[in-house]
């Protein structure tokens, strides 16, 4: 029976490249001359720390990071940006988390979405991925289009397509 897996993964190498590009853009920006501004990648925690001197500049750093990520093929909704900035002395900072894997709640939403659509496929939650199995490739492709079209707040990849 044909099947495929729905996953949510980010290539850390691409994130590293995006952070390096963002730092390069940061060094050439006129409005950041003489300002203490840093974009750091923490691969162990899967997060990016943004630090600068003002709240407005912090928002500019977020825009630079998002732009660099989009250029590297990382969707902007795979970044979990906190609404409140941390204030330490004269510096403002935000810890942007990278969304990896599908949480159980999101997997249940995907399963419910597919079952409610009456497409003749079966879904199984397997850890941080969802396996979709069906009798025909057309049903599987319809399920892919359904999940792509739904605004679930997280980017998904479809891999391991078996016939």
Curated annotation (Swiss-Prot):
Write out the transmembrane intervals.
none
Q: List the disulfide bonds in this chain.
A: none
| Protein keywords | Nucleotide-binding
- The yes or no answer to whether the keyword Lyase is present is no
InterPro entries, per the entry: DUF520, UPF0234-like_C, UPF0234_N, YajQ-like_sf
Q: Which Gene3D superfamilies match?
A: 3.30.70.860, YajQ-like, domain 2 (3.30.70.990)
- Looking at the UniProt record for this protein, which Gene Ontology cellular component terms does it annotate, in alphabetical order? cytosol
Pfam families from the UniProt entry: DUF520 (PF04461)
Q: Name one GO molecular function term.
A: nucleotide binding
What HAMAP family has UniProt attached to this entry? YajQ
Q: Which family does it belong to?
A: Belongs to the YajQ family.
Job description of the protein: Nucleotide-binding protein.
Q: Report the protein name in the record.
A: Nucleotide-binding protein APL_1231
């Amino acid at each position: 029976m044909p099947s495929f897996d729905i996953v949510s993964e980010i290539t850390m190498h691409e994130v590293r490249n995006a952070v390096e590009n963002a730092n390069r853009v940061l060094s050439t920006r006129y409005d950041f001359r003489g300002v203490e501004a840093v974009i750091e990648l923490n691969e162990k925690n899967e997060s990016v720390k943004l630090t600068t001197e003002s709240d407005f500049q912090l928002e500019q750093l977020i825009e630079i990071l998002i732009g660099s990520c989009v250029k590297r093929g990382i969707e902007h909704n795979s970044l979990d940006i906190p609404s409140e900035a941390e204030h330490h002395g004269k510096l403002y900072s935000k810890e942007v988390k990278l969304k990896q894997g599908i949480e159980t709640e999101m997997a249940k939403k995907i399963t419910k979405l597919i079952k409610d659509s009456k497409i003749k496929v079966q879904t199984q939650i397997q850890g941080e991925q969802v396996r979709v199995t069906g009798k025909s490739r057309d049903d599987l492709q319809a399920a892919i289009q359904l999940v792509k079209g739904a605004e679930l707040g997280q980017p998904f990849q479809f891999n391991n397509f078996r016939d």
